[in-house]
Amino acid sequence: MKMTSRKLSDILKKRLQNDSWSFHFDREKDSLRIEDKNTGKGITLELPGIIAKWEQKKDDAIDEVVYYTEEALNAMKGQSQEMEGRESLIYPVIRSTSFPEKSSAGVPLVFDGHTAETRIYYALDLGNTYRLIDEKMLEKEGWTKERIRETASFNLRSLQTVVKEDEVAGNHFYFFRANDGYDASRVLNESILAEYEKNAEGTLAVSIPHQDVLIIADIRNNAGYDILGQMSMSFFANGTVPITALSFLYEDGKLEPIFILAKNRPKKK
């Protein structure tokens, strides 16, 4: 069966059927908007990305979308989304530069530049989901952008790190997977990158293919670049929130995107 946006929209509507929710399929934008009728809050699902995952994972991909959608809508309805008094629940999240700059309601989101491929957004953790912080929230609660940055950075450094090491063809790869929603965000923790750079025997490279993994690689031979490229593409294709399939060289505290060419050293983008 060939999956189309219309078919996927119909499947999701059936799976998410709820008298309190409304659905709007936008054919031009290839998206499905789901809103709580009582609160007016909701989420917009980008269907092409879900179809790409469905082609690889079939019903498992739809199960994931249904789970996260239900969690998000229930959280929006049942929890306060004020920042005051919940400072410890504010974290930075990494997204691609193609990620929207405004919320579904048209309110500008709070974000900073990061690399040519990525941006830093800020989120209020709601348990099994989160809300991206927008400028309206800042204005309402009297917060400054600098306060958000400092608070999120402090909270990020307090998170526990869970790292798995793997050696492939003489190269060392370190996978950060605490599964707390902020694994990719750990790329913003300068002390982590500085430590790995100090101990690296080869060239230090970094990959942030999706929000739930950070890969740090100690590349000790040319094969390592190919291996990292393959890993990055695989994680990117299977992530719930993809970020970028490109990898980065880490030198002197800076990340520079690179293209990894088979059998060769990478070319700077």
From Swiss-Prot:
InterPro entries: DUF1444. Belongs to the UPF0354 family. This is UPF0354 protein BLi03134/BL00047. The lineage of its organism: Bacteria, Bacillati, Bacillota, Bacilli, Bacillales.
